[in-house]
């Protein structure tokens, strides 16, 4: 076989083997060196290929797809800085335990360190953020096809392993590498007769669920039984099954539940949200849990962590399905590597406890909910707080909600509306490394993975940061409904001490952008609306949520008004809480 033939065969085997693992979504960025990989993916009948001129957007799209499905999408790119553009999403995927497969094309050995064009050191580029990386040899007849296939199998296994995450395969290609038609038996396929007949991967890696030791379960049960003031914290949970089990445990034991917005439990009306209560110093002064069971990943709000840090509980137990350390304040006493939902089920007692604790919190929570509903009523101004609350109450249960970092996720965490009978949508966000980049692309990937429309709540700076990802919206199978909260800058910095440094604040932190989001929508051919009241926002979003095409709703405000509104609303909530304590 000549070089073109063996290169074509290798790439076909790679794509075919990935498909046999159920991996069909390919995110391809155009390039010359990656031609054989692109051609193999495009010509495989089982693939679903999306083209991304921007590699950064491709990687964040793959991230969103993985969050929705638990499966990796495959990234294909050419050599040079192309692969480096994947880095931010690879970091997020690593910290969020989400699988991604990177196939980067590279130059042959003799071009390195010679000044050859578009040639950088790509092997190991992602460092400790990849679960595994390897540089394949150049395609060669001397290498058995089984070696190539089993390497692909291992890469898939590592990406889905414990914990899941990004895997990088760097593949050098020597010219000429343009694909050719192959016919007849190939020398190195002779031993693959069974593989060709059964449509199964050459080998699989069985994934086992993490089950806690019985002694650990019994010890945790004993601590729960003896605790006088226990608290359950639900951090980031991507599985609704896990969320339901943890919510059921809190309800059965009559234990207060701190449900983070990323837990899939925050909008459930069966539990009183603690985020608004922690705004009150009187409440935090009396809030002194002696046992904390923290299920899942990290949480958004700082106030709980501050309260716990000031009065550390005797026992602070973290249960998550990852061996990654979670102990930012160094007060965790026991970390258990287990499936959160399965572990929660093991803690459920035979008899339920009385609901006096939850009822007392529920009465206070109901008054807070009433106050926030009045704040969003007709005739009131449309603010960032009311936008988040109205949106949380209106989004269809069958849709997905992606919340961008900075102010949107904090507002949703604190002020989200409660919904009856667990009817909340799936909530997703990039909280692994909590960057503001790639949010539009991630939300687009989430929509395609879920197979449902997704609403994205995002600030103006994050929106502009990922503006080119609006190109994705034209060819999407599922629409993305974008709500942009535009306060002309980085609104979150107005809440920080640096805001008092008037000589440097506006230029260096406020960063007014003064760009037209309406013009951006027109440029990319996306429908646009800009409501100015709660009533018009509700009408605009109701129309958009029923639409089969993507659209943008812009909510305008100012950073000064936003700061004042947060202070005013939080003061009203504190007054309500303080009257009850």
From Swiss-Prot:
It catalyses: isochorismate + 2-oxoglutarate + H(+) = 5-enolpyruvoyl-6-hydroxy-2-succinyl-cyclohex-3-ene-1-carboxylate + CO2. GO terms for biological process: menaquinone biosynthetic process. It is an enzyme of class 2 (transferase). The keyword Endoplasmic reticulum does not apply. This is 2-succinyl-5-enolpyruvyl-6-hydroxy-3-cyclohexene-1-carboxylate synthase. Keywords: Magnesium, Manganese, Menaquinone biosynthesis, Metal-binding, Thiamine pyrophosphate, Transferase. GO terms for molecular function: 2-succinyl-5-enolpyruvyl-6-hydroxy-3-cyclohexene-1-carboxylic-acid synthase activity; magnesium ion binding; manganese ion binding; thiamine pyrophosphate binding. Catalyzes the thiamine diphosphate-dependent decarboxylation of 2-oxoglutarate and the subsequent addition of the resulting succinic semialdehyde-thiamine pyrophosphate anion to isochorismate to yield 2-succinyl-5-enolpyruvyl-6-hydroxy-3-cyclohexene-1-carboxylate (SEPHCHC). Pathway: Quinol/quinone metabolism; 1,4-dihydroxy-2-naphthoate biosynthesis; 1,4-dihydroxy-2-naphthoate from chorismate: step 2/7; Quinol/quinone metabolism; menaquinone biosynthesis. Its cofactor is Mg(2+); Mn(2+); thiamine diphosphate. It comes from the Bacteria. Coiled coil: none annotated. Homodimer. Its EC number is 2.2.1.9.
């Amino acid at each position: 076989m000549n070089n073109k033939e063996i290169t074509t065969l290798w790439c076909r085997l790679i794509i075919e083997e990935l498909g046999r693992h159920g991996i069909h979504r390919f995110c391809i960025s155009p390039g010359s060196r990656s031609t054989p990989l692109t051609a193999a993916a495009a010509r495989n009948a089982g693939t679903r290929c999306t083209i991304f001129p921007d590699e950064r957007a491709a990687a964040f799209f793959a991230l969103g797809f993985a969050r929705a499905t638990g499966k990796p999408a495959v990234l294909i790119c050419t050599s040079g800085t192309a692969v480096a553009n994947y880095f931010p999403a690879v970091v997020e995927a690593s910290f969020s335990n989400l699988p991604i497969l990177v196939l980067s094309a590279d130059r042959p050995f003799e071009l390195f360190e010679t000044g050859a064009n578009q040639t950088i050191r790509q092997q190991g580029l992602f460092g400790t953020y990849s679960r595994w990386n390897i540089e394949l040899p150049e395609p060669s007849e001397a290498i058995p096809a089984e070696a190539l296939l089993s390497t692909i199998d291992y890469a898939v296994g590592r990406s889905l392993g414990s914990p899941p995450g990004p895997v990088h395969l760097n593949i050098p290609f020597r010219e000429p590498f343009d694909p050719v038609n192959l016919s007849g038996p190939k020398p190195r396929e002779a031993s693959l007769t069974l593989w060709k007949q059964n449509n199964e991967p050459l080998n699989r890696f069985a994934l086992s669920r993490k089950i806690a030791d019985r002694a650990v379960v019994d010890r945790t049960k004993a601590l729960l039984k003896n605790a006088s003031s226990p608290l359950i914290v639900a951090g980031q949970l991507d599985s609704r099954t896990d969320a339901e089990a943890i919510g059921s445990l809190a309800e059965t034991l009559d234990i207060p539940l701190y449900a983070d917005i990323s837990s899939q439990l925050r909008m459930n009306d069966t539990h009183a949200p603690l985020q608004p209560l922690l705004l009150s110093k009187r409440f935090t002064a009396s809030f002194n849990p002696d046992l904390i069971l923290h299920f899942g990943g990290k949480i958004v709000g700082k106030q709980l962590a501050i309260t716990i840090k000031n009065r550390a509980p005797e026992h602070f137990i973290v249960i998550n399905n990852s061996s990654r350390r979670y102990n930012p304040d160094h007060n965790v006493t026991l970390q258990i590597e287990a499936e959160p939902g399965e572990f929660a089920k093991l803690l459920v007692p035979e008899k339920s406890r009385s609901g006096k604790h939850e009822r007392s919190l529920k009465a206070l929570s109901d008054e807070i909910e009433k106050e926030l509903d009045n704040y969003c009523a007709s005739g009131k101004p449309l603010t960032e707080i009311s936008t988040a609350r109205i949106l949380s109450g209106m989004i269809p249960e069958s849709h997905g909600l992606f919340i961008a970092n900075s102010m949107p996720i904090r507002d949703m965490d604190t002020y989200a509306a409660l919904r009856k009978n667990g009817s909340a949508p799936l909530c997703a966000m990039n909280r692994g490394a909590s960057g503001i980049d790639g949010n539009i692309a991630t939300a687009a990937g989430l929509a395609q993975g879920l197979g449902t429309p997704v609403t994205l709540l995002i600030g103006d700076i994050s929106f502009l940061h990922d503006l080119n990802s609006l190109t994705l919206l034209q060819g999407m199978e599922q629409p993305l409904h974008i709500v942009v909260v535009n306060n002309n800058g980085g609104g979150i910095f107005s809440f920080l001490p640096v805001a008092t440094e008037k000589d440097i604040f506006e230029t260096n932190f406020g960063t007014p952008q003064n760009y037209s989001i309406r013009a951006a929508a027109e440029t990319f051919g996306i429908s646009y609306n800009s409501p100015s009241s709660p009533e018009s926002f509700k009408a605009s979003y109701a129309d958009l949520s029923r639409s089969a095409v993507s659209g943008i709703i812009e909510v305008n405000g100012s950073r000064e008004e936003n700061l004042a509104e947060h202070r005013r609303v939080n003061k009203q909530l504190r007054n309500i809480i303080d009257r009850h304590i």
